[in-house]
Structures are given as C-alpha cells and as structure tokens.
Amino acid sequence: MGAGKTTLSTAFAEQAGRQRLDVDRIVEETSGQTIPEIFAAGESVFRERELAVALDLLGRPGSLVLDFGGGAITSPPIRELLRERAITIWLDVDVDTCWERISGSDRPLAQDETEFRRLFDERRLLYASVANAVADDLDGVILAAAGVHVERGALRRLGELVPGAGPVALVSDPHVAGIHGMEAQLALGARLSETHELPPGEEAKTLAALDRLWQELRLGRGGTIVALGGGCTTDAAGFAAAAYLRGIPWVPVPSSLVAQVDAAIGGKTAIDLPQGKNLVGAFHWPVRTVIDPALLETLPDAQRHEGMAEVVKTGLLAGEPLWELPDDRLVRRCAAFKAALCLRDPFDKG
C-alpha cells in the first residue's frame, strides 16, 4: 500500500543475487485478468488466487524474494505460511507518505482515503504479528535478511535480541568482559546460565582454547552461545558453536570496528593452525548478529585505526566515502554492504 515494496524488493534482489517475484503480477498472469478486474468479482476471489500463488512460491526450493501486496496479511493461511516458511520484512512507512504515493492510481484500495487510513491502522497489528524484522530503506532490508541488528544501545537489550527462550552461554575475552561483560550479563538476565573466557586476540583461535571451552560448556541443544568481543572472539566462538553437539545457535556481539563492519557478519567461523590462519572452520550462520556502535567508544586508538582501514576498503568497493560518516551511520552502511556480499555468496565461493 505505497510502502515502496517494488522499489526496495527489486534493489534487494539485485544486491543479494536472488530472483524477485511479484505475487500480484503472477496472480494476474495466471488469471488472465488485472487486479481491479479480479477485485470487481469480490476481494475473496482475489485472496483465493493469491493464496494459491503463495502456496506454490513458498513451497519452491531455493531463496526467492517475494513481493506481496499489502492486503495479503489479512489472509490467515498466508500469515501462517509466512511464519513457517519465510523471513518476513515489514516495510514500515507512515500513512501520509503511503497515501501520497498511491492516491490517484487504479489500485482498488486507493480510491477512498478514509478507508485507506482505516485499513492502514488495522493491518499494522497483522504486520507486526508475522514480521521477523522491520525496515524502511534498502540497508535495513539487507540487514534484516542477513539477521543483523544494528542499534546504539543494543547491548542493554541483549536479552530481548537473542532469539529463542533457552539458556545462554556468554563467551568473551578478559579485556572485553571487564568493560562490557557485566552489562551483557544483566541484559541476558535469567537466560544466562554460564560465562566463559577465551584468550585475547589470535590466541583464542587455537584448538587448545576451544578444547577447554567445549569441555566447560554445559549447554544442551536448546542453548545459545553469545560471543561478545572482537573478530577473533567471534570467529572462535562461532566455530565452537558449529561443532558443539553438532551445531547449536550462536549470536555474535562484535565490540571492535573490524568485527562490526566485517568480521562478525555472515557465516564464516574458523580457528588457526601453525601452518596458517583460518584453516579449520565451518560456515555456521548466526541466528542473529547484534551490533551496538556504542561499544566503539571504549576502543583503543590502534584498534580503531585497524578498523578504519576496513572501512576505507569497503567504501572504495561501494564507491562511497563511508569513512566520512559518523560512527552509527558508518557501521550500519558498512555492515549492510558486507551483509549483501554474504547473502549473494554465503559460502564464499568467490
């Protein structure tokens, strides 16, 4: 209903290397009628045809980008399908903007502003009931699709942001734990069942460090590892999660600039061998990545400079001077760029 789905879904599909399909257009093609013509026979007729198309598309293998019309959410079977088979992103745009975009068009719901506003308010609750994430721009859609949450102050809401309801093991290094560990523990609340420390830096990415962590862990298959720290911590803890009990969920909470804009995004996890770095690992996507730019305020200058080198590289690839942005926008933009690359090539095949 004027939220910009067509524009954003098209751009997202291009960035993520996915096929985009417009559900309304497929309904028209399979029916041999336009949407207004179908609606003339009654909205229930359209909803039946829409459901048939949704069942087909959501049952196909592979990753598709599906653009549903705003009214699809009123169908209980479609809501159930979206909960079970899709990552659903709600494009949340204010009602005035939506009406301005569609008024005067031939859309069935664009003929009466009062009715449009009533439906807008009514459907918001339905959107919220199925949405996995909310976005209002392309970066937001990319981040949501990759399971990346960027928010200043997110560490304080960590308990809300870690998916599931099972116990959590917090893994960090001594330095980061000393600065942010208590806040993370308080945020996790009753879900926190155990805490563990890995050595700082590359020492975390050794078999000896992970062997000790695996032996200390007491989580079951319903537990989640939360990795709070820089790229070495998230690399190691992610691989620990990938191998422990043949794989349990994990959530990186990167605290360094390098990790926030690059290392902690996507499914690559690894440890080192004497012969070289990252030689043993697994692709194990986090159930969510929680990025709090406020954590950068305690970052030593040397680590910030290291991170800015990654920002400059990302900016050059993106064709934008990202290094000129303030921290919050810089992190969000770089994270979205990396997330798009990971969505396009999740197994780093090049």
Predicted regions and their residues:
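A glycine/threonine-rich phosphate-anchoring loop and its flanking beta-alpha core
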Residues: F239-P326
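ATP/NTP phosphate-donor binding region
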Residues: L143-T224
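NTP-dependent small-molecule kinase module
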Residues: A11, Q15, I87, E122-R152
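Active-site segments that bind and position negatively charged phosphate/pyrophosphate groups
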Residues: E324-G350
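ATP-dependent small-molecule kinase phosphotransfer cores
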Residues: D22-L81
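Walker A/P-loop
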Residues: T6
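ATP-binding Walker
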Residues: A3
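A glycine- and Lys/Arg-enriched "phosphate-lid" helix/loop adjacent to the NTP-binding pocket
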Residues: E84-R124
